[in-house]
Amino acid sequence: MNNLKLSEEIKRAINELGYTEATPVQKAVIPVALTGEDIVAKSQTGSGKTAAFAIPIAEQVEWEENKPQALIIVPTRELAMQVKTECTNIGRFKRVKAAAIYGQSPFAKQKLELSQKNHIVVGTPGRLLDHIEKGSLNVDKVAHLVLDEVDEMLSMGFIDQVEDILSRLPKQRQNLFFSATMPEEMQDLIKRYQDNPMVIEMASEKTNPIFHVEMQTDNKEKTLKDVLITENPDSAIIFCNTKNQVDELTDLLDVKASKIHGGLRQEDRFRAMDDFKSGKSRFLIATDVAGRGIDVDNVSLVINYDLPIEKENYVHRIGRTGRAGKSGKAISFVKTNENPLLRDIEEMLDVTIEKKRKPTVIEVKVNEDAFRKKQQKRPTIKKARGEKLNKNIMKLYFNGGKKKKIRAVDFVGTISKLEGITAEDIGIITIEDHVSFVEILNGKGPAVLEMMRSRKVKGRRLKVNEARKR
């Protein structure tokens, strides 16, 4: 990573995030993206593609510009939040501000956020289009467009909305398209919206074994329990085709499991995802719609309780296992009438999905005790990638904003004059109508908090406190 031509602010962030060695897709994409060329990248899930586009975008945005300069379109809310977090972390020391816009979140609250300075906007197609049509998202200065998981947006029927958004963007812009597969409809999209793009096709790095278990009778629940006991994974994702099936399995399995599907409230979906990512839950039971936003390293087992209805989704599902060079395994339950779909998947992947027999009664009995002990063991909580980067940051709350004619430069001017503080110690600044939030970096938050209690901002004495987490 240190060999890339990046600013010191971006290099510092990626080092603190632990990006010491670039993945193959990052090595291929980042240098080309920094030149402004259009790119089509075929890359599997878990290959590091988010950083592959987030790094060059964070590098190229101009801090002084108030309107969004990059638009990143993704298929799901979970993915929108994850990409936004990644962009924020990578751009932390350059003070790059990113917003996540998606459905089932209050429109008015998003409108207020979009009225602030935002360098990058990440969102789902429908809600992005709503904001553009209503004038709350200005796209006049968008110079970088990313379509992430293009094949997923095609299969979910979002393409008309995506094209509507693209038709409203400036013609002169960089277009970066990322996809795990390359369906024919995507080729049409490339021809219409990209200018002689660099095509980057990454060979699959995965050597993770993939199997299928034949289901002769309707005994999938018992087989699932037996497979979990004999495999005894540290973590596993179980994919179902319906939310009812997700609910039933969550109740049926005698293990601590999180669940995620489109019928849950957004905060419950985020909480379930956080619990699984952190290791509080060893198992996650999910549908495809919700599962597309799952970005978790070190998942040791993926089980397709139901084969996906769309064969392309198989690629996304099994891409959740292993990741980043770690080993993993994928097992699919296949009924007799699903054999044609299994053959289609094998043809698409150009592999043979090996048949695996069901665990025997003896195998289950032998492994049952070890499985129970692992489930009862207190989980080791995993640290989030951005934890090291964010631990020396304090966000301050001030009780004044736009209505008092206060701007970001007023805070920068005042705080940078404090003893021992420079502009490099100031992070992202958010100015709302009646309040403002200022991030203080490098562990200097407590000192700034104390000194600002007796300082004025633009001639006004403002209340200042450490901001509550929102």
UniProtKB/Swiss-Prot annotation:
Residues that, per the record, bind ATP: 43-50
Reported consequences of knocking out the gene: Growth rate decreased at 37 and 25 degrees Celsius, slightly slower and to lower optical density at 3 degrees Celsius. No effect on motility at 25 or 3 degrees Celsius.
Short name of any one Pfam family annotated for the protein: DbpA
Motif DEAD box per record, residues: 148-151
One annotated GO biological process: response to cold
GO molecular function term, any single one: ATP binding
Enzyme Commission code: 3.6.4.13
Entry's localization field: Cytoplasm
Record keywords: ATP-binding, Cytoplasm, Helicase, Hydrolase, Nucleotide-binding, Ribosome biogenesis, RNA-binding
Superkingdom, natural source: Bacteria
Induction: By growth at 3 degrees Celsius, and 3.5% ethanol, repressed by 6% NaCl.
Residues spanned by motif Q motif: 1-27
Enzyme class (EC, first level): hydrolase
GO cellular component: cytosol
Region feature Involved in 23S rRNA binding, mapped onto this chain: 394-470
Catalytic activity field: ATP + H2O = ADP + phosphate + H(+)
Gene3D superfamilies in the cross-refs: 3.30.70.330, P-loop containing nucleotide triphosphate hydrolases
Domain Helicase C-terminal: 223-365
Chief subcellular location: cytoplasm
SUPFAM superfamilies on file: P-loop containing nucleoside triphosphate hydrolases
InterPro entries cross-referenced by the UniProt entry: DbpA/CsdA_RNA-bd_dom, DEAD/DEAH_box_helicase_dom, DEAD_box_RNA_helicase, DEAD_helicase_DbpA, Helicase_ATP-bd, Helicase_C-like, Nucleotide-bd_a/b_plait_sf, P-loop_NTPase
SMART domains tied to this protein: DEXDc, HELICc
Family: Belongs to the DEAD box helicase family. DbpA subfamily.
Annotated function: DEAD-box RNA helicase involved in the assembly of the 50S ribosomal subunit. Has an RNA-dependent ATPase activity, which is specific for 23S rRNA, and a 3' to 5' RNA helicase activity that uses the energy of ATP hydrolysis to destabilize and unwind short rRNA duplexes.
Domains as described in the record: Contains an N-terminal domain that binds non-specifically to RNA and a C-terminal domain that binds specifically and tightly to hairpin 92 of 23S rRNA.
Protein name in UniProt: ATP-dependent RNA helicase DbpA
Organism: Listeria monocytogenes serovar 1/2a (strain ATCC BAA-679 / EGD-e)
